[in-house]
Each structure stands twice: as C-alpha cells, then as structure tokens.
Amino acid sequence: MTTTTLKPTLGTLHLWGIAVGLVISGEYFGWSYGWGVAGTLGFLVTTLMVAAMYSCFIFSFTELTTAIPHAGGPFAYSRRAFGPAGGMIAGMATLIEFVFAPPAIAMAIGAYLNVQFPGLDPKLAAVGAYLIFMTLNILGVSIAATFELVVTVLAVVELLVFMGVVAPGFSFSNFVIDGWAGSNVFGLPAIAGIFAAIPFAIWFFLAIEGAAMAAEEAKDPKRTIPRA
C-alpha cells in the first residue's frame, strides 16, 4: 500500500509568513469589540489570559508537529492517540475553524475597501478577495506562501507606522477611565466582562496553529517549524 505525501517546498521564512499572516488580521479588526464588553483594563486582563493559554497550546502543538509532521494536524495527532473517532472529532473541529475564518476575514477586507471606495459593494469585494486567495492556493503552496510573506511584511510595517503615529498622543489616564466594563472599580461586572471578551481576545491568535499544519510541506519540519 503506497502512502501519498505532499512535496516539501516551504522554508523557515515561508512558515513565519504563514504563522504571522494567519493572525495579523486580528490586530486590524475583531479584537476591538472586547473594549466594549470588558473595558480597556478588563480586556487587557483577558488578553493576558488568552496569551498564556495560546503560548502553552503552541508549544505543545509544535512538539506534536515535529513528532508527527502531517498536514492533518489535530486530526493526525488525535487519531494516533484516540483512534479514528477521536481523529474525526478533532478534524471536524479544526475544519469548522478554518472554513469560517476566511469568509470573516474576506468580509473585513470588503468593509475596509468600502471605507476607501464608498461605491464598492463590500460583499462583492469580499467574494473577490476570497476568489483571489483561493486561486493562489490552487496554483501552489509555494506561490501562496510567498505572496502571504510579502503581504505579511507590509502589514507588519503598517502596524509599526500606525503605532509610531499614535504613540505621542497616548494618554494612560484616558486609557484607564471606566476601564473595568464601564466602571472605575473592579467588581463582579468586570469579571463577567473579562470572560465575555475572551472570543475577541482570541482574534489576536486565531489560526496561528496553521503554520504547524503545514509541516508536511515544510523542508526539515523538525527545525523550520520551531524557528518560525
């Protein structure tokens, strides 16, 4: 019985571009709704909690990836540990994440373009963006990864420029006003807001595990993935 494998074409830079590119959209949109739910200070606590969770998750995920370099990701790991049923459950959960995340990002792209070009239908722009990215992936993972690397570098530069522009006007005293879910005092509403804001804090890290799932297409995954 022959085993079909994917061609390893991705280097460390490609994997870095995939990892950062998958999550950097969360720095542009999505997370800011957490301020409305938890307040600035409450959302800061939420973000630190989620960051700790994702740090543990990624270290564990990377270890699994280097041990089992399979494009199935969680499906392959769970199948090895819990059998076909466990693999199916993990695979379906991962599929749901990666099926629904791209349309959400495409809609955000459409909304951004609509701000710059009011006459442009954001839904049509979203469909166009989705088709472009889908075509790039069909053409080949190397082409798609190179394109994502270039776009990711540009996105990082834009964020740094934005932070440099707004930093002189930052006021910590304004930042902490009503910082606990609309109150200046930490209490039960603040705790509720902290937990309610978890989905928005996840936007900072959502889909970062996608880089590890490219292990089967990575050159020397035991070295390149941890570096990325």
Could you tell me what each predicted segment is?
Residues 27, 63, 97, 148, ...:
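Acidic-residue sensor for enzyme active/binding pockets
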